[in-house]
Amino acid sequence: MSRIDSCCIIDDDEFFAFNTKKLMKQIGFCENVLWYADGQEAIDSLVGLLIENIPLPEIIFLDLNMPNKDGWAFLEEFQNIPKHQRENVKVYIVSSFVSPENMAKAHNYASVTAYLVKPLTAESLEKVA
């Protein structure tokens, strides 16, 4: 049984997204996984969900380095969504390396819960759930 009803991966790395979705289903972490290749596609889709009165995913796994709209730009726009519609969403930044500068910057965003290192594993997802 899934622990999370819905989550979202925002990352331009198709290989990472595919493997993470597969892992999530294998361990029963989440059944409904949305994937967006850049921040603009994600913000447009999430706003569309709200327009249709569909709640936002409970968890967002966000890469920082993407074309079009990167993770930081996504976070800026995400803050424009009314607080009552986003306050239960946990954002986890996912990155291939830990940058002290990025970790410090992430603390400026109330929605950011933690900074995770790629690839995500069953153990790292257990800590999220």
PLM features per residue range, with description:
Residues 35-48, 71:
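Helix N-cap/capping motif at the beta->alpha junctions
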Residues 55-59, 84-90:
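His-Asp phosphorelay/catalytic-motif detector in bacterial-type signaling
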